């Protein structure tokens, strides 16, 4: 997308000033409508180092009540976060209905870094892109408004800004080694960025490339895009109809009525012998999956009083208590109900080498 992108004509300073006042006022008014309509908004800022992602976020949030937003800076994943699925730490950040989440970098930056380092390529890249597209589509299908901005500056402008930051000890920390590497390998990075933008540009979550060569012009582009999209989201919500969401292919299993339980019994002595043997085997497997860093999810469903709790107890007796967690799932709490249905399950996923047991 970057290779074919042409920046819009930048207006005169006086026009930018007038339009900024209008856009700021509109966003201030719309924040209450977002709350009333219970529309969750994710605003993702990606782009070149020193392109103004953080400063633009700072200007935008001045027009929103602090109670209605949060800002998350997604730096390099920690060793702990690397033990979870790639999208885990981003799913944790999604906002409640009626609120905003601003992300200073996100899944694009991490994916492009992995591509540039050679950590993912070919089939690995394709799988990553597929998972990102599903992730974004799940959210937008669930009523989330997702705004994705890429802050674009040329190589000379990036170098100029980095020099200004590096010349002062109080701002030197804002230029990372990767930012400097980006500028040295600008063409290589631009190729990766452009490919990623094309691969993840969807009608439900399109990319907006922002000409960030001028700070106020960049702020205006972001604000006007936010305002127009919020207005459309509220109109769409008023005319929305229920749709079948997130359909995945399922394995064929027998119907419950076709399962004969009459011969599924054994005497107590045989049961105790097999239980002891299988618990011993399960304990060995638990050690192996920890060494191989394999995460395991065990899910229980069934009628009340069907024996789920007792079965879980007999399984956990064989496991190292440091390597598993049992999650009883009841009706969602208000803060859970205000987010995507899967949020409360994503936040309970096991890290690699561990087991999560869901009681429903």
Give the ranges of each region predicted by the language model:
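Glycine-rich phosphate-binding loop of ATP-dependent small-molecule kinases
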Residues: 1-360
């Amino acid at each position: 997308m970057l290779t074919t992108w042409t920046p819009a004509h930048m207006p005169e300073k006086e026009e930018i000033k007038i339009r900024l006042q209008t856009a700021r006022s509109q966003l201030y008014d719309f924040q209450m409508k977002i709350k009333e309509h219970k529309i969750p908004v994710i605003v993702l800022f990606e782009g070149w180092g020193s392109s103004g992602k953080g400063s633009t976020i700072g200007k935008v949030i001045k027009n929103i009540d602090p109670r209605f937003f949060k800002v998350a800076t997604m730096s390099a994943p920690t060793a702990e976060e690397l033990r979870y699925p790639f999208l885990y730490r981003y799913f944790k950040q999604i906002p409640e209905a009626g609120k905003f989440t601003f992300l200073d970098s996100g899944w694009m930056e991490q994916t492009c870094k992995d591509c540039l380092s050679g950590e993912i390529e070919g089939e690995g890249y394709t799988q990553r892109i597929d998972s990102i597209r599903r992730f974004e589509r799940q959210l937008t299908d669930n009523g989330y408004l997702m705004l994705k901005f890429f802050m674009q500056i040329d190589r000379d402008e990036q170098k100029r800004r980095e020099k200004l930051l590096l010349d002062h000890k109080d701002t030197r920390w804002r230029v990372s080694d990767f930012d400097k590497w980006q500028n040295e390998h600008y063409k290589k990075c631009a190729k990766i960025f452009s490919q990623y933008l094309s691969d993840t540009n969807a009608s439900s979550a399109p990319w907006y490339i922002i000409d960030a060569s001028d700070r106020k012009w960049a702020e205006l582009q972001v604000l006007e895009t936010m305002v127009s999209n919020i207005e459309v989201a509220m109109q769409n919500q008023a005319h929305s109809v229920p749709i079948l969401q997130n359909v995945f292919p399922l394995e064929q299993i027998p119907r419950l009525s076709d399962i004969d339980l009459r011969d599924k019994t054994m005497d107590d002595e045989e049961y105790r012998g097999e239980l002891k043997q299988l618990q011993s085997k399960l304990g060995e497997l638990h050690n192996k999956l920890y060494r191989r860093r394999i995460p395991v999810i065990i899910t229980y469903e069934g009628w009340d009083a069907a024996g789920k709790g007792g079965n879980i107890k007999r399984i956990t007796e064989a496991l190292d208590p440091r390597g598993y967690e049992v999650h009883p799932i009841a009706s969602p709490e208000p803060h859970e109900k205000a987010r995507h249905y899967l949020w409360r399950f994503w936040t309970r996923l096991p890290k690699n080498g561990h087991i999560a047991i869901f009681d429903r």
